[in-house]
Amino acid sequence: WRIAARLRLPTRTVARAFCKASIGQVSRLPVLRLAPVREEGNNCPFLTEDHCAIHEAEPLVCALYPLAQEITREGEVGYFLQPTRCGGQVFEAKVGDYLARYDVPAREATDVRWAQTCLALEDRVEALEALFEPVFQRRMQQKLWQALYYQYEITQPFLPQLEKNLVWLETELEKLSALQRRRNVRFDKSIEKIER
C-alpha cells in the first residue's frame, strides 16, 4: 500500500509490475516481495543510480537493514542485527537513534497490527485448509489476497482499511465454510443412498 500510494497507482498494478507473489510455505498466507531486476544485477526495481526512488515509502525491511524486526503475538517488538557482508559503510549507532533516523517508530503500530493479523490468519487458514476442498482453498486464497493486498484505496489511511478488510474477510470465510458444510452434507447423503 505504501509503495502504491507513493507511486499513485492501484495496489494490484504495483504488485504485478514490481513484486513477486507467492504463498508462504509455513504461513499459507499470500506474500508479496519486491522482484529483483535480473538485468540490473538482481537489484531492487526501485534502485536508481544508487538511490531509492521510493525512499519515503520504502518497505520496512529496507528501512531497517541491517536490522530486522520481530513482533510477538502479544505485540512486543524487538530488533536484532542481521549478519551482513554487504561491503557498505560501517558505522556505530544506538538502535533507537537508528530507528528514528528511518522513521520506524512512527510506523510501528501499523507493523504490530499487520504482524498480529498475519499470525492470527495463519491459524485460521491452517484450520480451513484442512476442511476445504481444493476449489474452496483457491477461493479462500483469492479472498486473502484481496483483504491483505488489493482491496485498498491509496488516498485513504491503511489501518482503517485493513480493519474493514478483515471484517469483510471473516464474512467471506464464513460463507465458504458454510458452502463446504453444505457440500459435505450432500456428499454424506449421497454415500448413504449408495450404501443402501
Predicted regions and their residues:
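Short loop/turn segments that flank or connect secondary-structure elements
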Residues: 1-196
